[in-house]
Amino acid sequence: MKGINPFYFYIGMALILASIVSILLITKSILLFILLAFGSLVGITLILIYISRKILKIDKGRLKKEVKRIFGNRVYKILRLMLVLGYAGFIYFSGTFYNSAVLFFIFIVAFTISEFYKTYRIRIYEKGILIEGIAFYSWEEIEKTTNKDKNQTILKIKGIPKKIVINEII
């Protein structure tokens, strides 16, 4: 694999967002919040630019197909959403409900709900697969099986929890 695993990249983004909001809740300094948010945005942008340039230099071969698929397990997302809402309910009924805590929970719930609809753009090349433009996997790293009855190709990539089903034999 060359690049960043897109599944863990988005989890890292959620942790960065949670840490920024937590620091805001602790310090209550809007200047520190703006500096952290801007610094994180610049850092992530620089990392993405570096990785995309690095991946552009890789010899991928000819583009065969481009598909969009959803990764992740919906059961874990629902459990995480229930945990966050349960914690929000606990804080609400304990009487220590702050406006900043409301914002924090709105961010986490919105991020979790948005993951239900997150689709990844997958480009299939002769020499491998490019996911979201930030991760390139060669065919040696991918476990590929075909289901000729349903005319499907099933790809299992290490580090991505869900199999990718393509409605065409590659």
Swiss-Prot record:
One of its GO terms (cellular component) is plasma membrane. The chain crosses the membrane at residues 6-26, 31-51, 91-111. The keyword Transmembrane applies. Keywords: Cell membrane, Membrane, Transmembrane, Transmembrane helix. It is a multi-pass membrane protein. It is found in: Cell membrane. It comes from the Archaea. To M.jannaschii MJ1249.1, MJ0210.1 and MJ0785.1. This is Uncharacterized protein MJ0795.1. It comes from Methanocaldococcus jannaschii (strain ATCC 43067 / DSM 2661 / JAL-1 / JCM 10045 / NBRC 100440).
